[in-house]
Design a protein with these regions (language model features):
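Outer-membrane beta-barrel "beta-signal"
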Residues: 173, 208-221
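Transmembrane beta-strands of outer-membrane beta-barrel pores
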Residues: 33-41, 73-77, 108-114, 131, ...
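Gram-negative (and chloroplast) outer-membrane scaffold detector with strong preference
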Residues: 63-148
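Outer-membrane beta-barrel proteins
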Residues: 18, 56-65, 91-97, 137-143, ...
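Short glycine/proline- and aromatic-enriched beta-strand/turn motifs that initiate or cap beta-hairpins
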Residues: 21-77
C-alpha cells in the first residue's frame, strides 16, 4: 500500500474518540474494504483485468459548519495502466431523512505511483493532485435491510478530465458493537488526458478507463 495512504488511515484511526456513548450522540465513524474486479480499457482498446483493493474511512460529526471527512484508497495494477488513487473528501449532508441520505462536497484526488503505456509502447506517469466535485446518495428500501447506494466524483482540470462513479446495493446487519454492512455493485473510473503522452507524436489524447463489479464490507460505530 502507498505509504501516504497508510499513514493517513492510521492517523485517522488514532484520533477517533473511544467513547461508545459519544459515538451514539455526536459522531459516526465507518471503516470499510472492497475488492474491485476491474477490467481496463486503454485508448479505447480493451486490455487486461486486475483485482483492485479499496480501503476507506469516513467520520461524520455534529459540529455546525464543519464538513464531514472521508478518505479512500484504491490500488489498480494492470499491464497498460496502474495507479494509487487517494481521495480526500470533505462533504455536507444536503438531505438526511429516515429513508434517504444525500451528501455533496469536494474531493481532492492524489494519483501516485501511476503508469500509462502509450500505443507506441512509451510509458508515462500522471502523478498529480486534482480537484473534483463529490456527491453520494443512500436510499433505504422500506421494510427491508437493503439500501440503494451511489457515489459520484467529477473533475475537469487543466489537462485531465476525470470521473469515478459507483452504484450498488447495501445490506445492513446490526450487531452489538455497531452496524455491519455488506456491499456489492459496479464502479467506473474514467480518465481523459490532453497532454500526457507528449513524446508520442501520434497521440493527441490519452484515455485510461476501468470498470467492473465490486464486493465489500463496512463497519460503522
Amino acid at each position: 500500500m502507498n505509504r501516504t495512504a497508510s499513514a493517513a488511515l492510521v492517523t485517522a484511526l488514532m484520533v477517533m474518540p473511544l467513547s461508545a456513548s459519544a459515538a451514539e450522540s455526536f459522531y459516526t465513524a465507518s471503516v470499510g474494504a472492497e475488492m474491485w474486479l476491474a477490467s481496463t480499457k486503454i485508448d479505447n482498446t480493451r486490455r487486461d483485468d486486475a483485482n483492485a483493493p479499496n480501503l476507506y474511512f469516513t467520520f461524520e460529526h455534529g459540529f455546525p459548519y464543519l464538513p464531514n471527512v472521508g478518505l479512500r484508497y484504491t490500488n489498480l495494477e494492470a499491464d497498460f495502466a496502474s495507479f494509487d488513487k487517494i481521495d480526500y473528501t470533505f462533504y455536507y449532508p444536503l438531505l438526511n431523512r429516515e429513508l434517504m441520505k444525500f451528501d455533496v462536497g469536494i474531493t481532492l484526488t492524489q494519483n501516485a505511483n501511476s503508469d500509462y503505456r502509450a500505443p507506441d509502447a512509451r510509458r508515462y506517469d500522471f502523478d498529480q493532485t486534482t480537484f473534483n466535485w463529490y456527491a453520494s446518495a443512500e436510499i433505504t428500501i422500506p421494510h427491508t435491510p437493503f439500501d440503494v447506494i451511489g457515489q459520484f466524483d467529477f473533475g475537469n482540470n487543466s489537462d485531465l478530465k476525470s470521473s469515478d462513479v459507483m452504484a450498488g446495493l447495501q445490506y445492513h446487519l446490526p450487531i452489538r458493537a455497531g452496524d455491519l454492512a455488506f456491499k456489492a455493485g459496479y464502479r467506473v473510473v474514467d480518465l481523459e488526458f490532453t497532454e500526457l503522452a507528449k513524446q508520442s507524436t501520434d497521440v493527441k489524447q490519452s484515455f485510461v478507463f476501468a470498470d467492473g463489479w465490486f464486493v465489500g464490507a463496512q463497519f460503522s460505530f
